[in-house]
């Protein structure tokens, strides 16, 4: 995944890595990660820091080296791209821009692409995605729906 990064991105990530790596030993420890996160206004617990490190710590040494950092950043960028795509798709459905997809909006879109569904079918689609039972689909429900596919 890190192989999809440009030379410029890698150089920028090397600079960021150096900011985290306070003692310049080529590794980011939970202590160093915590220091940087706190300086950015975050307040992670020790276990959260350990979890963050373990998520990308391929060689299980309890710290993040630069290749592991690149992998983590490439994943984050990929997630961000797909989040942006999901948000764009959501806007297509959310015609009035109120942050929710109503049955009427879903019905309109499906009709405009040639789908012939009954009101009951559209209501059932909304019901399946509507986890908070407010009769509409919000961005979180929409994202969960797409992630389940």
Swiss-Prot record:
Binding site for Ca(2+) 2: 57, 59, 61, 63, 68
A Pfam short name: EF-hand_7
Binding, Ca(2+) 4: 130, 132, 134, 136, 141
Keywords noted in UniProt: Calcium, Metal-binding, Repeat
Coiled coil (UniProt feature): none
GO MF annotation list: calcium ion binding
SMART domains according to UniProt: EFh
Residues annotated to bind Ca(2+) 1: 21, 23, 25, 27, 32
Residues annotated to bind Ca(2+) 3: 94, 96, 98, 100, 105
GO terms for cellular component: myosin II complex
Domain EF-hand: 8-43, 44-79, 81-116, 117-149
Function text: Calmodulin mediates the control of a large number of enzymes, ion channels and other proteins by Ca(2+). Among the enzymes to be stimulated by the calmodulin-Ca(2+) complex are a number of protein kinases and phosphatases.
Family, similarity comment: Belongs to the calmodulin family.
Note: This protein has four functional calcium-binding sites.
Protein name per its UniProtKB record: Calmodulin
Lineage, opening ranks: Eukaryota, Fungi, Dikarya, Ascomycota, Saccharomycotina
